[in-house]
Amino acid sequence: MRLFSSAFAHIFPKKAAFHLFGAAIIIVFLGVGGCRPERFVANADLELRCETDTVLFDTLLVGAGSITKRFKIYNDEGRNILIDEVYLAGRIQSGGSAYRININGIPANALTEVELRARDSLYIFVEVTIDPNQQNTPFLVTDSVVFRSGNRTKAVQLVAYGQNAVFFNEEVLDCNMVWDNTLPIVVYNSVLVDSGCTLTIREGTRVYFNKNSSLFVEGTLRIEGTPAQPVRMRGDRLDPLYRDLAGGWNGIHLLRGSTGHRIENLDLRNGTIGIRVDSLPADADSVNVIINKTRIHNCAVVGLLAYTARIDAYNMLVSNCGLYNFLGDYGGRYRFRHCTFVHLNSGFQRGYPVFGLSNRDYNNSPSPTHLELENSLVWGSRSNELVLDSSGSGTITTLLSYSIIQSETQRPGVQLRYTNPKFKNPSDNDFSIDTLSPAFQRGFDLRGLYGGRLQTDLIDQARAPSPTLGALERIE
């Protein structure tokens, strides 16, 4: 003890030590006095302030949970208050509520004696999952969160719309199945059209795909949309945060050996690879895929990907995809008439051109490659948006005519290079042509050819004798 005392004597004189000891005693007593519990007062005249009077969810597919939404309740009083009860009104209904709430971090559909400090706030988190019923059209699902103090109550309304659907989950589809627009189609974990079978998708059909889901086709795919009622394919997250997010689902995959595909009036968005074509027909002169009046937009990797395929496309718009809008690899034959391939004003960091084509050898065999591009637009923010890779041993032949191409290389038949086609509003994904566009009335009249497919444009407007280049006709 003497050692301890002597060790500190030179640091703290006796008088100073006494004062420090006294100060410590005072602090202890102050601390004890400050440990009184906070008081929370129940008040029948309490007036809570709500951040909103309604929480609105977008239309939800039945069985699919919503995103979590939140709102706040404020205590504007200068004292702590006690809320008698916070509860979900529909909890006592038969079958319960479609909604779930979390009260300031506590998952519960009802809490009593909820404390709220002076000039503080309370978080309420809300989710909803809607059960199916017999309705074909969207239906309303409501509830409310109620706050009760004494005789006073305040309620925040919860509003969502449910949409029934037909669900498929990791299955081989019935042979020669037809999907129609009676109810939306929802695909979980992918589906397969078997060899020798055909899937027909009628006009106006909406198809929603869960994350990482694909439509695989070993047989034949027939998409029969119309300009007024296109077939729509999307991811199944419909809320604003996710509905325009690229990579929300995989895409259509036309497998090797499949053939006879016809795609009319399809609006496909937000996939990973929009349409992938692996098919190599036995007859080298046949066509795997015919595409007409189709839009492919905002795919995370490639809009249209083809391996040694044969594709004819008319009035097709492929826009703002992550790596390529179109990529043809290991050769193939590709004929595009009145098509637009464009990448502008997207959130992607781009390191690849809009349009790529390669004759790479496959299994040490040459891959002949043929490209026809007529009355078309290939445009983007890079200096060279059309790249032909001739590293393979197969021949490459091209027929490029009456087209505007953003390219460093002058290719035979290209009408204009480095000439901005002046899209009307690309920031809003409007790739129609502005009034003073050099693409206006610069095309060759193809209306009498190719089965009349080019008499009208992507949105069914009549084409002029001197047509606008690209998928969309400029109407004066």
Model-derived features: positions:
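C-terminal motif of bacterial Sec signal peptides marking the signal peptidase cleavage site
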Residues: 30-34
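Surface-exposed binding patches on compact interaction domains or structured appendages
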Residues: 36-56, 76-127, 132
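Buried hydrophobic-core signal for structured, non-transmembrane domains
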Residues: 68-75, 126, 140-149, 266, ...
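Terminal connector regions
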Residues: 131-164
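Extracellular beta-helix/beta-solenoid repeat scaffolds
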Residues: 182-244, 260, 315-340, 344-347, ...
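Right-handed parallel beta-helix
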Residues: 245, 259-319
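Predominantly extracellular beta-rich ligand-binding scaffolds that present long acidic/polar faces
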Residues: 279, 306, 311-432, 459
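Surface beta-loop-beta hairpin patches that serve as ligand-binding interfaces in beta-rich domains
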Residues: 434-476
